[in-house]
Each structure stands twice: as structure tokens, then as C-alpha cells.
Amino acid sequence: MDGVANKPDCMVSVRERFGFDSDLMVPAFSARDDHVPDIDDAYRFNPDVTLAILAGFARNRRVLVQGMHGTGKSTHIEQVAARLNWPCVRVNLDGHISRLDLVGKDAIVVRDDVQVTEFQEGIVPWALQRPVALIFDEYDAGRPDVMFVIQRILERDGKFTLLDQNRVIHPHPSFRLFATANTVGLGNLNGLYHGTQMLNHAQMDRWNVVATLDYLPRDEEIGIVCARVPELADEAGRPLLESMVSLAELTRNGFATGDLSTLMSPRTVINWAENCQIFRDPALAFRLTFLNKCDDAERPVVAEYYQRCFGEELAVASRAGGGEPGAGR
């Protein structure tokens, strides 16, 4: 990160850089380094969520992006950072991330052929002292002791105290903090996200901006799949893509009405399209990509959705049936 300026050294237009009807100017870096994400030209930005994230970069707001799985929450933040050349680090708050991982710990190192105990900083003090956007993924799955470490830095000018070092770290002026979550801190209400926690409301209240990222409009979702799987972008592949996205929309509506306990995300549709190129059979690819993840009792409903969109029956086998129907074709 030595090659990156200590602070943003240029201003960019949101209208020119992101194509939105906005007069907002945001700070950016003119040079890139290894921590800047790669630009994905196929990514589609949600205007409201993008403006919320840009407010985080421009005005040092703490931004939490909430949405269902596969909507591209973390990627959304990364792609904004990529276009600002802002260094970015993601930390997944799984059950194995501990307070010591975030804060730091004493470690035995060799200095001049002698073993000595030395304090090694965790990711939080490391990022706080640098022009870095720190992203906490799966924020609502973090353990309580970990969450209270994060609470210290949620204040915009929040200083971080290293008790083991008797040292107070002042945030770098270009440090930014973001997080992504499937829930809004209320726990696993719909049964989809096991392992999520009910979050302390005092901590949720410290987030300056909470943005909700929903699934893309139909045409934009088709455009993303075309960009990811260009083999289906021609006139012959377009009807197939439209049927695939129509089926995904039916599963989402079925989930909303309680007919299904799972749904197809844009990520699932992309996986299905990629698997179609492998198996050369949309029905088989669909079974292997999504249907086999569904409960046995719900598979006839999904098969009906498939019949509506593709005009042909989908062979459905129970888990006890053994094997994939049509796998030998």
C-alpha cells in the first residue's frame, strides 16, 4: 500500500463514472494498488445503494448494506471502490473469527536468532491506520464478543484502544467502514439464514446509513447473465435466458407467498447458465444447479414453474430415487 497516496488526490463525477443522474462529486485515488478490487465491466449498479455507498466514501458515513443472498452486496461495495481506486479489504465474520483476530495478539517471533514475544496487530488496527475501506461480510453472523470490538470503531471519529499496548489509535482520515448482512439484526426470521444473530440495537443505531439491495429488474438480470455467459448472448440463446430468468422470478414469488422455502438468486441463474454450457441440457443443468437443493415436497411446485416457462415437463426424482433422471442423455 506504499504506492497509494495517503489520501484521495482527485475528485470524480458520479454522472461520468457511474452513469447516474447526479451532480455528486466524490474523492478518489489516481493510482491503484494491490488492495484495489478489479473492475467488473459487467456489474450493474443499483442507483440508491450506489449513492449510499458513495456517501460512505465521500462523507465518511458508516454504511450497512442488507439484502438476500446472491444480490451482490459485497461485490457492490467492491465495485464502487474499484472505480474510485480505493483500497479495500473484506473480512468474513464467520464463527471462527475471534476478538484476537480483529484486535491482535502476542506472538513468538525470532529476532537476531533469539525468540521474543511481539504484539502483532489484527485487521482492525491495521486498517484503521491506512486509507482502506474495511468491509465486514456476514455482519449479522458475528459472535457477540466480536461485535462489541466493532462497536468501538462505528463512531465516525471513533478511537481504538489497544489495551495490551496501552495505545490509542486514531482513525486514518481516509479509513472507511462498511458491512453486509442478510438480515437487519433481527435474527433468522424466515428460516433461510441459520447462524445469524439478533444484534444489539445500540450497535445497529450506530450505522449512519442502511441500504437495502434487492434483486435486479428483469432486463438487467438478463444482461448480467449475458455478460457472464456470452455463449448465450446471441439470438438463439436469448429465449433460453428469458425463460431462465422467468423461472427465477417465479421461485421468488413462490417464496414470498410461502409456497417455497428457498429461491433462485441471480448467482444461481448464472450458475445454471454456466452449467448449461457444460451439460448441454437446460433441464439437467437446472436439476443439478437448483432443484436438488429443494425439499422433496416442494419439487413438484418447482417442476410446475419449469413447465410454465419452458413448455415441457421436468422429470422430478425424490432423494430416495437414486440418480439423476436424464443424466445419461
What are these regions (language model features)?
Residues 1-236:
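AAA+ P-loop NTPase catalytic core and its hallmark functional loops
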